[in-house]
């Protein structure tokens, strides 16, 4: 059975007595940090930041990494495109304010990468996001293999150990 409350989602582990401990992601779990200003125009009729803005914040942070040639070398005939985006909304964000987006690569494949991100307001995680990003050949509009130097650079933004040596390649899911 799924948990009815999205606020309970996050990283879980068992304590020695078998009970569940909720451990949400921390900004320190992500090698890339991006700050975005929340605008009045970002609010919805409920007075909080619109869910579409969560996706825009993730996109801006993704592009800060993927479109910066000092970080990620790119072939001139290719570009990154998003193939999938999932967002788990864990809490509200409000204007005025700042949101910090933590980003990392969790897997680098032949022509794509899996990126996970989290949005933080005042140290509290408001959302987790996972995206699949594909390198596309501009001429054929089809997936293209990642060049070795691009793969190597992307791996530099992969998940750091979480303290016990395990990679942070999880994706929080509700229990069944």
Residue ranges and their predicted role:
Residues 2-102, 106-176:
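Terminal targeting signals and extreme-terminal segments of soluble enzymes
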């Amino acid at each position: 059975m799924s948990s009815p409350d999205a606020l309970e989602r996050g990283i879980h582990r068992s304590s020695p007595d078998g009970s569940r401990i909720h451990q949400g992601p921390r900004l320190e779990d992500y090698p890339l940090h991006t700050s975005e200003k929340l605008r009045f125009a970002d609010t919805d009729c409920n007075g909080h930041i619109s869910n579409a803005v969560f996706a825009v914040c993730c996109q801006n942070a993704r592009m800060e990494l993927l479109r910066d040639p000092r970080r990620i070398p790119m072939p001139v005939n290719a570009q990154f495109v998003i193939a999938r985006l999932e967002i788990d909304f864990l809490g509200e964000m409000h204007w005025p304010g700042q949101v910090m987006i933590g980003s990392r690569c969790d897997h680098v494949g032949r022509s794509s990468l899996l990126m996970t991100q989290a949005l933080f307001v005042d140290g509290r995680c408001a959302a987790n996001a996972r995206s699949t990003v594909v390198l596309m050949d501009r001429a054929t509009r089809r997936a293209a293999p990642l060049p070795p130097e691009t793969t190597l650079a992307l791996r530099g933004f992969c998940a750091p150990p979480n303290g016990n040596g395990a990679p942070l390649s999880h994706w929080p899911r509700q229990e069944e």
